[in-house]
Amino acid sequence: MALQGTKRSYEQMETGGERQNATEIRASVGRMVGGIGRFYIQMCTELKLSDYEGRLIQNSITIERMVLSAFDERRNRYLEENPSAGKDPKKTGGPIYKRREGKWVRELILYDKEEIRRIWRQANNGEDATAGLTHLMIWHSNLNDATYQRTRALVRTGMDPRMCSLMQGSTLPRRSGAAGAAVKGIGTMVMELIRMIKRGINDRNFWRGDNGRKTRIAYERMCNILKGKFQTAAQRAMMDQVRESRNPGNAEIEDLIFLARSALILRGSVAHKSCLPACVYGLAVASGYDFEREGYSLVGIDPFRLLQNSQVFSLIRSNENPAHKSQLVWMACHSAAFEDLRVSSFIRGTRVIPRGQLSTRGVQIASNENMETIDSSTLELRSRYWAIRTRSGGNTNQHRASAGQISVQPTFSVQRNLPFERATIMAAFTGNTEGRTSDMRTEIIRMMENAKPEDVSFQGRGVFELSDEKATNPIVPSFDMSNEGSYFFGDNAEEYDN
């Protein structure tokens, strides 16, 4: 991946590395996922899981959550200082599903966090391997993005539920570092900032004293991350205003909501990475694949190829459709919750349908669900083609303003138009153009009005056959221009609740 200026590629962010060349990046990303795989194999041994049980995505998620919880310093400290009934701050665990007499049974397991940390470090050459932990967080975040709608969270912060395409990474923990920041959508950053400003309005001491100084630094850092995602000068200038405000308040909230709306057409750059469940890396390592030697990339053919050759199972409730469950997990694996369904369908080779039409609930099974009626099936995670993941937002004409559709943040670098309802979006921009940001607002609105829904993004970019690992022959799909495809339209998905 070409590095421009001081920008680090996301493989570098992912591995915490300094500037490296492509081969070094591939090796360090390989080392990271290889470590995850080795850890997973060791955990399966500890838990005495059969091969089949080890391929169960629900078991994978429990094991991933255990290691994330074992390394969550802040929460561990909090739990030790505020002991709550029935929670041992030194232990972590969750449901593990095993096959007994032709039925699935749930076993609740409990482990010392210290022990989990030891196994993780041992799998990662004695290091803490924070990059691997972040990678697991991003996989969980991508799964949440595909499974839940954030309508309630959007409404609470004064944003419009139709802006859900800006909400990538909204469930990522704060501690997810640079790699986490890279995959957060515009709406996610705006929401974090608005929450912060609201606290400042309600709590006089929020910006004051020693703590307030730290808060202020965090605020400015978040503003800079958001500014870096915008691609037009006017949007960036508005972010400078928000950042430099002496005492952030309602004016800043207004500006941020304005900017979030503008991002529906003047899209920001948001990174996309294919982060797979730990069991997939475990399967590959167990079969003798050496990730570090072979190298690995999160944004190229590698994850597609890995999924072509992995068999993963999932528990299925009696009223769920296994094909729909597969679609959900496929989207999560490729970070494609906010991609145009026309593009996803083309790459996957089977029709990808909107969330509201899926007969499936989330992947995880609640502790009060009856296991008697639960069966398992194979997840179909293979694809017909592969495509390069993008971080550009797909704006046409030299990364300037372009067409966007309420509800798409492109994942794949594939030529298409990005249809949008200009009337719907522009309706939100009547009113306030006075105040210190008036000229920037006027400029942003002008750019949005000039955007054309039929403009083509990612000119000349196509998908590739799975045999074409060097990406030499792009196949440029032709899409029905009038027919947009957004995943959350007309939707009744469950809400995400912490």
UniProtKB/Swiss-Prot annotation:
Q: What does UniProt list as this organism's lineage?
A: Viruses, Riboviria, Orthornavirae, Negarnaviricota, Polyploviricotina
Q: Name one GO molecular function term.
A: RNA binding
Domain of life according to the entry:
Viruses
- The name this protein carries in UniProt is Nucleoprotein
List every stretch annotated Disordered. 1-22
SUPFAM superfamilies (UniProt xref): flu NP-like
**What Pfam families does UniProt report for this protein, alphabetically?**
Flu_NP (PF00506)
Keyword Cell inner membrane, does the record have it? no
Question: How is this protein organized at the quaternary level?
Answer: Homomultimerizes to form the nucleocapsid. May bind host exportin-1/XPO1. Binds to viral genomic RNA. Protein-RNA contacts are mediated by a combination of electrostatic interactions between positively charged residues and the phosphate backbone and planar interactions between aromatic side chains and bases.
| Locus of motif Unconventional nuclear localization signal | 1-18
The protein's job, in short, is: Encapsidates the negative strand viral RNA, protecting it from nucleases. The encapsidated genomic RNA is termed the ribonucleoprotein (RNP) and serves as template for transcription and replication. The RNP needs to be localized in the host nucleus to start an infectious cycle, but is too large to diffuse through the nuclear pore complex. NP comprises at least 2 nuclear localization signals that are responsible for the active RNP import into the nucleus through cellular importin alpha/beta pathway.
Where does this polypeptide localize?
Answer: Virion; Host nucleus
Q: What family does this chain come from, according to its entry?
A: Belongs to the influenza viruses nucleoprotein family.
State the post-translational modifications: Late in virus-infected cells, may be cleaved from a 56-kDa protein to a 53-kDa protein by a cellular caspase. This cleavage might be a marker for the onset of apoptosis in infected cells or have a specific function in virus host interaction.
> In which residues does the motif Bipartite nuclear localization signal occur?
198-216
**Which keywords does this Swiss-Prot/TrEMBL entry list?**
Capsid protein, Helical capsid protein, Host nucleus, Host-virus interaction, Ribonucleoprotein, RNA-binding, Viral nucleoprotein, Viral penetration into host nucleus, Virion, Virus entry into host cell
Please list the disulfide bridges.
none
What biological-process GO terms show up in the record?
symbiont entry into host cell; viral penetration into host nucleus
Q: May I have one GO cellular component term? A: host cell
Is RNA-binding tagged as a keyword?
Answer: yes
